């Protein structure tokens, strides 16, 4: 339930940044969020392998307490933009979904992109336990360090947006994700193939994610948290769906089944962008 807290930082960064630096601010915060997710896999993999799963949660709780202190001390207090009741707030979110086609499209892209991403990361540990790898969760977690390279590279989206349109950045980002699945299919039984694929899928997802959020935060300056609520709810629903389908695909078809799931969601993401994005050229 409280894992929603980091998502509040994204609209906060957008609100605090000057207009010309909004994309860079969102990119920086989102890179931190995704790198944290990836590094947590390294952390949990090694700690779980050598100390046990309980220690993972104990150390995590201590770190969150320390982080709470830093947030309390250093983050500025921002007054809410919405002055109505909670019921009216919920109605306004529904109204945003109805009246903002770019929000709906960005949410769908985010959901399908994160579904493909989650399909890979959910089943990677199963894949590495099988031939020809025969390794444990510590090695699977170490791939998070590799993925962090792609996530950090995506922080440059803010600078790239000054050269390319957001629509084109999203298009190329989805293509990068699609290429990553090509590596997983052709070279997924080699370490180097997985490494290249991990860098590409993290780069592609993060670049698209930052671009999506740049779009939605530009829709209504006073509705940053509300549009982010719609987007991130869709995003995590997509991730849960990708996890569920990929786990079942692994049971029945092993690695090839997972690749098929990833390619399916990525293609749906690409097709929706091409068909429904009015600014796509």
Where are these regions (language model features)?
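Pair of pore-lining "gating" transmembrane helices in MFS-fold secondary transporters
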Residues: 99-119, 199-200
